[in-house]
A protein has these predicted regions:
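Short, conserved catalytic or adaptor-binding loops enriched in Gly and charged residues
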Residues: 88-96, 186-190, 297-298
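Conserved inter-motif catalytic segment of the P-loop NTP-binding fold
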Residues: 2-4, 10, 17-19, 23-24, ...
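Hydrophobic positions on the alpha1 helix immediately C-terminal to the Walker A/P-loop
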Residues: 46, 50
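DNA transaction DNA-binding modules
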Residues: 225-341
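Gly/Ala-rich phosphate-binding loop of Rossmann-like dinucleotide-binding domains
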Residues: 55
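Pre-Walker A (Motif I) flank of P-loop NTPase domains
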Residues: 29-33, 68-69
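Phosphate-binding/switch region of NTP-binding enzymes
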Residues: 34-36, 40, 44-45, 73, ...
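Helix C-cap/helix->beta junction micro-motif
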Residues: 121, 157-161, 301
């Protein structure tokens, strides 16, 4: 029996370990990524552009790439169709980008095929499998176990060789507030992947789409893309922090301005709204928002919020933290204790 390999906490705490690297900076990590979208949305155009960028070491949407050999398994295409796409995308191509239109199934030896490929191309950085369904075989096993087992074979291969493998897959036609729930199959697929990408249009005929990104080493991001002249162009990129700020009610930004020249403010929610000249927000809502954002947005803007119920009514206490030390402490807050718990 193989002995269990363990690492103690002290070693993990002090030993420098190599961090995951990115084939496309801050976007595509080494390991396994799922790239999902509806049929005919333009996934293959984006994958080809990505492969061209990595093979030539040129940026993708101003993000640096790690140059190296690239293999693109175009399993739903022909070489003629790939050639037509190349004509449209580039005047120059690198010999470091290889294409194949057929390969073995996972159950028949695909991983062995890929291992042999790496012997000839040891400087490989990226492999794209387009699509997942083309390398799978029908299974009578539990759907989750089948999904997890298939994707884990590819992930283990990617991890062994510290390269990025992107598996192209489809999404279901269903409404869901979480786009990642639309990925076809069970959570065994997304659960095993290091990163998941979903490319989605609001309307089929639209030339713009959203690319949603999440992963273990990849922070949540949203990209707005426009498809023009067979290319996906970047319109806007939003990080998790930027998206979080977009959910902050506008009235709280005005509250920060209101408190800018005040040490403290004490009164009811109704009095606060009147003092700010707010007519569109009701007292119960402003009270809820103050509590919801007190440890995030308000704290980041050096505003402390406290709330109390007394015989003479419900009171709100706001105070600006004095100084610019940014230590986040409450030692400078001067709110009368009768209003605080």
């Amino acid at each position: 029996m193989q002995k269990l390999q363990t690492v103690n906490a002290e070693t993990l705490l002090y030993e420098p370990l190599e961090k995951p690297s990115f084939v496309v900076d801050s976007l595509i990590p080494t390991g396994l990524s799922l790239f999902c979208g509806s049929q005919k949305i333009g996934k293959s155009w984006l994958m080809l552009k990505l492969c061209l960028c990595v093979s030539q070491g040129i940026p993708l949407w101003d993000m640096p790439t790690m140059e190296g050999d690239v293999l693109y398994l175009c399993l739903e295409d022909t070489f003629c169709r790939i050639q037509d796409r190349l004509f449209r995308l580039t005047d120059e191509a690198s010999g470091r980008l290889q294409f194949a239109v057929a390969c073995l199934k996972l159950s028949d030896g695909l991983i062995v095929q890929l291992e042999d490929y790496l012997k000839d191309y040891p400087d490989s950085r990226l492999i794209v499998i387009d699509t997942l369904q083309k390398v799978r075989t029908a299974s009578k096993d539990n759907a989750y176990a089948s999904d997890y087992g298939d994707i884990s074979l590819i992930k283990d291969f990617a991890d062994r060789h510290s390269l990025a493998v992107i598996v192209v897959h489809h999404i279901r036609k269903q409404n869901d507030s979480d786009v990642f729930n639309k990925v076809s199959g069970t959570t065994g697929l997304t659960g095993s992947a290091d990163a998941t990408f979903v490319l989605e249009k609001e309307k089929r005929a639209s030339d713009t789409a959203k690319l949603y990104v999440t992963g273990r080493d990849t922070p949540y991001q949203e990209y707005t893309l426009r498809f023009r002249d067979c290319r996906w162009e970047l319109v806007e990129r939003k990080t998790q922090e930027q998206l979080a700020k977009e959910t902050i009610p506008d009235v709280l930004f005005r509250l920060v301005d209101f408190m800018r020249d005040k040490e403290e403010w004490i009164g009811t929610a109704t009095e606060l709204l009147a003092a700010m000249g707010e007519t569109e927000t009701i007292p119960t809502v402003i009270t809820k928002w103050l509590n919801e954002y007190r440890t995030t947005f308000l704290s980041e803007n050096r505003i402390c919020y406290q709330y109390s119920r007394r015989k003479d009514g419900r009171r709100i206490a706001l105070a600006r933290r004095a100084g610019d030390s940014g230590d986040g402490g409450d030692s400078d807050i001067r709110i009368p204790p009768c209003y605080c718990h």
